[in-house]
Amino acid sequence: MTQQLTWHDVIGAEKEQSYFQQTLNFVEAERQAGKVIYPPAKDVFNAFRYTEFQDVKVVILGQDPYHGPNQAHGLCFSVLPGIKTPPSLVNMYKELAQDIQGFQIPAHGYLEAWAKQGVLLLNTVLTVEQGKAHSHASLGWETFTDKVIEAINQHQQGVVFLLWGSHAQKKGRFIDRHKHVVLTAPHPSPLSAHRGFLGCKHFSQANQHLLDQGKQAIDWQLPLSL
């Protein structure tokens, strides 16, 4: 594995592509027109700020950002401190409590501590209009995040991908299963969690795969309060 590669090295060229410029221009024009777009502009690329390319150990794929006030901040499934934990994350915490010995459910939904340990919390679409789920689904973000996954697939070794729900599983279809570990389950949403997300033991499995490679396991425990 090449240690010194950065996000800029592997996906920097995407920023020069016309599709990417068009996506950014559209989002900016929507903001200028007075529409409320989440997350705020400064947070759109936070997943890449908190987790440097060579530090990626685990990838959790989300769909698009939360579309309620003060929730989204650029990390999938995560919400800002002081905001009620959303239902899918409640189920993730339930699974962690069953799966990871001693895990205590925190009183918040802020997942920055995972990101700083090498868990890339990546939504496949990076912006959304307030109150309108999937409103930015066909802008070009998907092309960009495909390139992100391709870069990890190509340049890294032994990354554990957690793909929950059909959307994430389709997105991960080209990941090389000989180089990486792919764990799949239904989405943690209340609509589907009982179909096999709860009981999937993905968090402990991810850690076992990391330990088997001589990597440090993820400490899934979050601060109980912020």
Curated annotation (Swiss-Prot):
EC number: 3.2.2.27
Key words, A-Z: Cytoplasm, DNA damage, DNA repair, Hydrolase
Location of this chain's protein in the cell: Cytoplasm
One GO cellular component term noted in the UniProt record for this chain: cytoplasm
GO process terms (BP): base-excision repair, AP site formation via deaminated base removal
A Pfam entry, by short name: UDG
Active-site residues per Swiss-Prot or TrEMBL entry: D64 (proton acceptor)
SMART domains: UDG (SM00986), UreE_C (SM00987)
InterPro entries for this protein: UDG_fam1, Ura-DNA_Glyclase_AS, Uracil-DNA_glycosylase-like, Uracil-DNA_glycosylase-like_sf
Record GO terms (molecular function): uracil DNA N-glycosylase activity
Top-level lineage group: Bacteria
Transmembrane segment boundaries: none
Catalytic reaction annotation: Hydrolyzes single-stranded DNA or mismatched double-stranded DNA and polynucleotides, releasing free uracil
Entries under Gene3D superfamilies matching the protein: Uracil-DNA glycosylase-like domain
UniProt record similarity statement: Belongs to the uracil-DNA glycosylase (UDG) superfamily. UNG family.
Protein function: Excises uracil residues from the DNA which can arise as a result of misincorporation of dUMP residues by DNA polymerase or due to deamination of cytosine.
Protein name: Uracil-DNA glycosylase
Taxon lineage: Bacteria, Pseudomonadati, Pseudomonadota, Gammaproteobacteria, Vibrionales
